[in-house]
Amino acid sequence: MMKLNLFINANETESYIDIHAPKMNDNVQSIINAVNDLDKSHTLVGYIDKEIHIINVSDVITFQVINKNVTAITSNQKFKLKLRLYELEKQLPQHFIRISKSEIVNKYYIEKLLLEPNGLIRMYLKDAHYTYSSRRYLKSIKERLSI
């Protein structure tokens, strides 16, 4: 059972959160991730031809660089973005994982993983396609997915 204390003090100049725990565990990590995600973007602007769309970030399966353009792929649409992948990576919530130089994946859409003999990870996504991680990001991917 976790206990919550809230202290409102008009003399404070900024809001902050202290976490007191006997040890680091999944609940504590979930709280940290949720707090870190508060300042992250939850919507993005995407383009299909000359149409401008507001995209809910949680609907995005993957962000890929296609023909030098960053593309947000949802279950039924592909949207071009005006951001670079590294800029996007800074704005996204914790459940997005950089898996290669040209792709960021929403971990909630990963269905299964296959470790390839060459050391890469093949990721099967819920939209029935798969993608590969690059070796450079392998350690980070394993940490983020707890494998």
From Swiss-Prot:
UniProt protein name: Uncharacterized HTH-type transcriptional regulator SACOL2360
Annotated localization: Cytoplasm
Annotated GO CC locations: cytoplasm
InterPro entries: LytR-like, LytTR_DNA-bd_dom
PROSITE patterns xrefs: HTH_LYTTR
PANTHER family linked to this entry: HTH LYTTR-TYPE DOMAIN-CONTAINING PROTEIN, TRANSCRIPTIONAL REGULATOR-RELATED
Gene3D superfamilies named among the record's database cross-references: LytTr DNA-binding domain (2.40.50.1020)
GO molecular function, one term: DNA binding
Residue ranges occupied by any HTH LytTR-type domain in the UniProt entry: 44-147
Induction behaviour: Up-regulated during anaerobic growth.
Major location category of this protein: cytoplasm
UniProt keyword terms in alphabetical order: Cytoplasm, DNA-binding, Transcription, Transcription regulation
